[in-house]
Amino acid sequence: MASHEINQSKVVAERLDVADEKYRKASSDEAFNINDNVTAKIQNPLAHLTKEEVIRDVEAFALENGFQDMTPLLVKGALVAKDPPAFESVEGLTDVEKDGVRNEVLHKWRQPKLLYFTIILCSIGAAVQGWDQTGSNGANLSFPDALGIPIENKFPDGTVNPASERNLWLQGVINAGPYIASAFIGCWCSDPLNNYFGRRGTIFVSAVFCALSPIGSAVSQTWDQLFVTRLLLGLGMGCKGSTIPIFSAENAPASIRGALVMSWQMWTAFGIFLGTCANLAVKDTGAISWRLQFGSASLPALPLLLGVYFCPESPRWYIKKGRYTEAYQSLKKLRNTELQAARDLYYIHAQLSIEASLTNMKTNYVTRFIQLFTIPRVRRATLASFTVMLAQQLCGINIIAFYSSTVFVQAGASVTNALLASWGFGLVNFAFAWPAIWTIDTFGRRSLLLFTFPQMAWTLLAAGLCYLIPSSSSAHLGLVALFVYLFAAFYSPGEGPVPFTYSAEVFPLSHREVGMSWAVATCLFWAAVLSITFPRMLDAMSPTGAFCFYAGLNIVAFCLIFLFVPETKQRTLEELDYIFAIPTRRFVSHQCGTVLPWWFQRYVFRRNVGECPALWSFDGHMDNDKEFIETIRRSSVAPDERRRSVVGKLANKF
């Protein structure tokens, strides 16, 4: 029996060698155009090099950047990056270094404390964003009357309010102020600020605006003053929203990048929840309640302001500036071993050297913006990020986040009960964001979106139809709240975390700041449009019409995502260059001609048609072979029991 297992293992090993030889040959034989990846292959820039070529290139890199004293470490790191499944065969690796690489697969959440501290600070920045949104939610019930712009159709004495329609528009514009300023100014300031001050400096500047502007809103005496302070808040929100997801994405390892970067939405949801708590806490303070509701949003900005400089700067930003020594120091703080830091330093350098082929010369801000639409690889990322950001507004989440108190009052709730119902919405939104930590890197960004959008459509439709129940019925308010909560439960693990995570990772480093600015500006511009129009829409179409309208937009968003949003899970930021080099026409053709028919065969006609054929592969391996590579890698780092199990599976496969 033992002899049979040994012979079987030898056969598997020989076949793995043959497969590996084909893998290397495919990598070296095919030229690659980063703007037109017609072969749909994702390539490791080191895989086609011989060991001697890698060593020679690393030595030249070390000499050029002052790393002569750590050349052996860089060589080991480059050889590990060259062939990740075979890292055990690299000469000179210590047991500690091997354990560090193993744990990337077996214990991917074992990361340095400073990485988690950085993500916590970024999460606080997200909470600021959420709290800023809900301050106006509660204040909507009282600030119009306090500032002389009453929105009711009739005054308490029964006389008609002739300015009601005008004041509804003013209320919408004031609520939209931060999003108008973010979309047209704040987001676009992030590129020059990032260029001169780095990621941390930009976050600091934005935190100053986010700390002071809510205080200005709280002391405003006229609606004009309130509008100006809301515009100033938007400057900080735009810079922060464009920078923090990038900062998280650039610091996180690929295996958990999605889960860490999605903390932006999870903690935005937490900020929304805290904002609803603050609205409830101050509701009985009389005439100043709306001032406290606006002003409380400055509280989470203070720890962000003080803590950001305790985080390491983005190593990719340092590399972009040619500051490799500082990049390595940052990576040492963000990785478990110096080997992993050296490996990532050289691998990022190698990928960015290829990425530099996008632009052969240094470009200014305006040129980079134009290139979002003219360079094919960047244009595809621009389209995908635009789609997911637009979808966040099409789904209708912000009609609840901005106006839930108003919506529940129209459903027959008292002011206190409306604030309590809004608090429940904030709690559900936050609680159901947690599953995305585990699912976003397992099922993927695209899969989560395609599953949750149909669910959001029917829950919004149901919520709207529940307004047709007579208001005297006890079921009226309860069912409206139930379906709004179900809507939030489906939104939170899908369209909630994905847009900012996705947009932060899809652009090449050369265009990452301006690309993220574009994505966030898209999101906030349409949030402004929604905020301005919804009060009037609610008045003209009734809650039933407004909710049904947004239910239909969910279906539109589903179709756009299906056609234009590729999957990005578990790829390094640099490997995404190859995914977005696939022509849009080919991607759409694959979705319509392959994926859609497969889905109908599998789930409608219930036929056993196997796995859906993949569009891209990794260096010559088709999708099933990608699983095969991961199986080999896991077998090289797993305990003996798992290794024997994997060898048996591979033997059966061959």
PLM feature segments, named:
Residues 2-332, 353-654:
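Alpha-helical transmembrane bundle of multi-pass membrane proteins
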Residues 334-344, 350, 357:
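Short intracellular "coupling" helices and adjacent cytoplasmic loop segments at the cytosolic face
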